[in-house]
């Protein structure tokens, strides 16, 4: 049978106290809406309709081209939100999943199981439920002695007996598509909130003697709906625990998983060692046998095999096999480090390519530069790439030796096998195989220091 899906993403999320629509708040690197959308895709829906409202344009940008959108200009309840999908889905045959866009922990496996349960039991409606240790505040699932679902009762309306029920409504449902939109025509706003509730559809089906079932989640965490920053932090914690467990099962070692922060789309090869307080974000990929030490922060970068990154930051860059970075190095966007490069402590590389086996051991800035293989940068080397208005490029050939405390003022080119003397300021091209000396001549004035206040004889 054919599956369809409706994702409810129109709400403002007042309790988030944010200008950002609630469903766009991120969990492990992507928005809650994207998490839900990915899980929904596990049921292979022929059509997915996302209901948007508050700051609809922002929400639409996140899933542009991946779903159909309908607008809920007034937020009049969950039932009203589902009504907005009627022009797209009402005449179709199959079953429709209805899910909130603020449930980032739901898994595709659970949604597939829910759909299968719905079909196998020939239900008109199936409620996704969970067993809560503390069900206070949730709608309870009331069953008869045969285990059949009778109704959903909200906390404020529950009797003392019903309040003891631990099975709760998660707010996710599967409906026979045609019957869903027929029943929606019969719900009203005769309730304390003055809204159209999707749960009223369940009551209509029961009154008609139609079969309503409930499928219970194995993991209560999946039921979490995020309404405030506290729940958002809970979702973040659960998601990161899942992510880290997945990587450990796949052969990655963590010194302290609870203090390691890895986004959902990060890829890590086996035999990688990850120490505490490491953060890996975005589309980062880490090659096999790499070591990431305490304090390393990597964003949208590709790291090769057998690299060692020590307490350093790498952003939007590529690092080849066998490279060592840090401690306290900063590889800024647009940089590439070739095989066996060494970038040491307090070195910054920005928008530059560095050739194989090149070494910048300490206290160096390499910006907007193209650096060949086997180059050595002495401590304190600075490529001066900005004149206050425009940035310029430095080109350094292979096998170049740059002495300590040298300043290379772009645009300039250092030819292959050249040498720059320590303390030089280079403003002109240096030919291949040449030595460049660009510093003032040293002058010694004999006994002159005796005239100065610091000298012992003057104290």
Swiss-Prot record:
It is found in: Cytoplasm. Transmembrane segments: none annotated. This is Bifunctional protein GlmU. GO terms for cellular component: cytoplasm; membrane. Residues 1-229 are annotated as: Pyrophosphorylase. It comes from the Bacteria. Residues 230-250 are annotated as: Linker. It comes from Streptococcus gordonii (strain Challis / ATCC 35105 / BCRC 15272 / CH1 / DL1 / V288). Its main location: cytoplasm. Binds 1 Mg(2+) ion per subunit. Its cofactor is Mg(2+). Keywords: Acyltransferase, Cell shape, Cell wall biogenesis/degradation, Cytoplasm, Magnesium, Metal-binding, Multifunctional enzyme, Nucleotidyltransferase, Peptidoglycan synthesis, Repeat, Transferase. UDP-N-acetyl-alpha-D-glucosamine binds at residues 8-11, 22, 72, 77-78, 139, 154, 169, 227, 332, 350, 365, 376. Homotrimer.
């Amino acid at each position: 049978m054919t599956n369809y899906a409706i994702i409810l993403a129109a709400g403002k999320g007042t309790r988030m106290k944010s200008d950002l629509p609630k469903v766009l708040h991120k969990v492990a690197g992507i928005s809650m809406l994207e998490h839900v959308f990915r899980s929904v895709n596990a049921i292979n829906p022929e059509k997915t309709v996302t209901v948007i409202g508050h700051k609809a344009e922002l929400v639409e940008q996140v899933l542009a081209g991946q779903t159909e959108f309908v607008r809920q200009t007034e937020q009049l309840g969950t039932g009203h939100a589902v009504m907005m999908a009627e022009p797209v889905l009402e005449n179709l045959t199959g079953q429709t999943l209805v899910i909130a866009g603020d449930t980032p922990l739901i898994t595709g496996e659970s949604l597939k199981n829910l759909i299968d349960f719905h079909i196998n039991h020939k239900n008109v409606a199936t409620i996704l439920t969970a067993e809560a240790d503390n069900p206070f505040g949730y709608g309870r699932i009331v069953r008869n002695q045969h285990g059949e679902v009778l109704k959903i009762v909200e906390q404020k309306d529950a009797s003392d007996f019903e309040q003891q029920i631990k099975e709760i409504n998660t707010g996710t449902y599967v409906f026979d598509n045609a019957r869903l939109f027929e029943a929606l025509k019969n719900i009203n706003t005769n309730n304390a909130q003055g809204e159209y509730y999707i749960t009223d559809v369940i009551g209509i089906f029961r009154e008609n003697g139609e079969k309503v079932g409930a499928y219970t989640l194995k993991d209560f965490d999946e039921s979490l709906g995020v309404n405030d920053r506290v729940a958002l932090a809970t979702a973040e914690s659960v998601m990161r625990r899942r992510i880290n467990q997945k990587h450990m099962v796949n052969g990655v070692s963590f010194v302290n998983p609870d203090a390691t922060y890895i986004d959902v789309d990060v890829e890590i090869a086996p035999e990688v060692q990850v120490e505490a307080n490491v953060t890996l974000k975005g589309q980062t990929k880490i090659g096999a046998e790499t070591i990431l030490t305490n304090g390393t922060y990597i964003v949208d970068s590709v790291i090769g095999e057998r690299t060692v990154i020590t307490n350093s930051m790498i952003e939007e860059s590529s690092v080849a096999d066998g490279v060592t970075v840090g401690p306290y190095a900063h590889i800024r966007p647009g940089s590439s480090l070739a095989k066996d490069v060494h970038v040491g402590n307090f070195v910054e590389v920005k928008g530059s390519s560095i050739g194989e086996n090149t070494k910048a051991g300490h206290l160096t800035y390499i910006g907007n530069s193209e650096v060949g293989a086997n180059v050595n940068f002495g401590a304190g080397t600075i490529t001066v790439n900005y004149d206050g208005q425009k940035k310029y490029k430095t080109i350094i050939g292979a096998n170049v030796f740059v002495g300590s405390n040298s300043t290379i003022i772009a645009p300039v080119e250092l030819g292959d096998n050249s040498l720059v003397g320590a303390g030089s300021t280079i403003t002109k091209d240096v030919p291949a195989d040449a030595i460049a000396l660009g510093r003032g001549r040293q002058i010694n004035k004999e006994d002159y220091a005796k005239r100065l206040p610091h000298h012992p004889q003057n104290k």
